[in-house]
Design a protein with these regions (language model features):
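Residue-level signal for beta-strand positions within conserved beta-sheet cores that form or flank
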Residues: 31, 76, 117
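Active-site catalytic pocket residues across diverse enzymes, especially alpha/beta-hydrolases
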Residues: 26, 71-75
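Catalytic core of DAGKc-family lipid kinases
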Residues: 88-153
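Short, acidic/small-residue loops that bind anionic groups at enzyme active sites
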Residues: 76-92
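Short glycine/serine/threonine-rich phosphate/pyrophosphate-binding segments
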Residues: 63-68
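ATP/NTP phosphate-donor binding region
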Residues: 1-54, 58, 96-112, 123-129
């Protein structure tokens, strides 16, 4: 592993103490050439000139889902490692308190990669929405019949 990205939810680490600690721990364990830190809200503006070996997402489930969605739109094939520093962390790989143990496993290649399917939600006259976990369909302000067409390939 030579190049990693760290996506941080700035509202969870407004003094950058957590992101600095994570950078230091990765630098201690790995001989990294580059760490790119970016605001998770700005993932859609991320331009990579060289591929990353890993993206670390610091935040909660919402942060992880946002980063995964935006990375998939760019067709970057890169593993995402979620570290929960938020309130909800069902999708994250670990909690921040487990970082030392997790990085040891990562260094010793004691992990597995999970491929996740994405949902593509297309609404008439709207931009398609890509989702990792779920898509919520809710009625608007007017009560009326709703017609759904759901496909799987």
């Amino acid at each position: 592993m030579k190049r990693i990205g760290i996506a941080i939810n700035p509202s969870k680490d407004n003094e950058n103490k957590i992101v600095q600690m994570v950078k230091d721990k990765f630098n201690e364990k790995f001989d990294l050439e580059e760490i790119i830190v970016f605001n998770s809200y700005e993932t859609k503006n991320l331009i990579l000139h060289k591929p990353l070996d890993l993206i670390v997402v610091l935040g909660g489930d919402g942060t992880l889902l946002n980063v995964a969605r935006e990375i998939s739109k760019k067709a970057y094939e890169v593993p995402i490692f979620g570290i929960n520093i938020g309130n909800l962390g069902f999708l994250s790989s670990i909690d921040i308190s487990e970082i030392d143990k997790a990085l040891n496993k990562l260094k010793n290649q004691e992990y597995s990669l999970e491929k996740r399917m994405l949902l593509n939600c297309i609404q008439e006259n709207k931009e398609p929405v890509i989702a990792l976990n779920d898509v919520v369909v809710a009625r608007g302000t007017l009560s009326r019949m709703v017609k759904f067409e759901i496909f799987i390939d």
